[in-house]
Amino acid sequence: MGHLAILFSIIAVLNIATAVASSDSIYLKGHRVGQDIDSLYRVYDNGTMYPVTFNEWLNDLTGMNDLATNNATILKRDSSDVSCVTETCQYVDYHVDDEGVITIDISTYRIPVEWDSGSAGNASYGVSKRDTKYETFCKKKICGINVSGFCNAYDFAVHAFDFGGSVYNPVSGITDRIKEATKRDKTECLGYELDHVRIDPAVDWSISISTWKQGSANCDTQASADSLKCAAQKALESEHNHQKTAFCIHLDNGGSFNLDIRLISELSFSKYNPWALPCPKYKGSNSWQVVSDCFQ
């Protein structure tokens, strides 16, 4: 099967996919006809394409945006890029605020489509709301810990929920459990999981928490349990579900210690296998469906 045939099969199967980080290519998630396993492909405007890993894609996307902190490219602190391949286009908006929070908003859409006069930016490219998917990547250092998140916005919403302001106040209890499990993990080197902890019966959200299981390597860290608790609590307190049904926050100390916090609505397909929900920097993952409100 030729490159263009594969490309068309990818677009036909999934319609639209995820992000772009350069002017001559886009990234599409799809699979070859007759195969059930999705892969991530980098597709160039000349029709050539090759498979990439999730980490390669994320490094490409964030690597361009990291240049925004360089004084020589200060204009990249606020910039936008549009790339198109055949009938699929991707629009990437970069922003770095004064507190160092990096936000990358991505929309992926098919053309030609109906014009959306409700948005000047969308109207310029003839983007139809129903044919567009939105995703956001964020990263920030909180309490000395690297915190990152990636989200999809869905066409339907679960009940509005503020994780920091809930009457059930789950954040403090969750982070206390994270702290105690982290202490144990650093001494026993076993990794740990907290599975399906119901945090609010009114809206049916549950939480699953895990450290990466790297044996003794996951114990060799300078990250204190208090720092991890502080970062987790501040990140969770900034979260609002909006139109999100499942998301993940990733924490690491820049070394070997890694912690993933998955919050999942009972309406989400992910409830059947929460550990299959990918997280930012998740090793070996070629998918994305995790979340952050940019920790504001």
Curated annotation (Swiss-Prot):
GO terms for molecular function: toxin activity. GO terms for cellular component: extracellular region. Glycans are attached at N46, N71, N122, N146. Residues 1-20 form the signal peptide. Keywords: Glycoprotein, Signal, Toxin. Kills sensitive strains of yeast. To yeast YER076C. This is Killer toxin KHR. It comes from Saccharomyces cerevisiae.
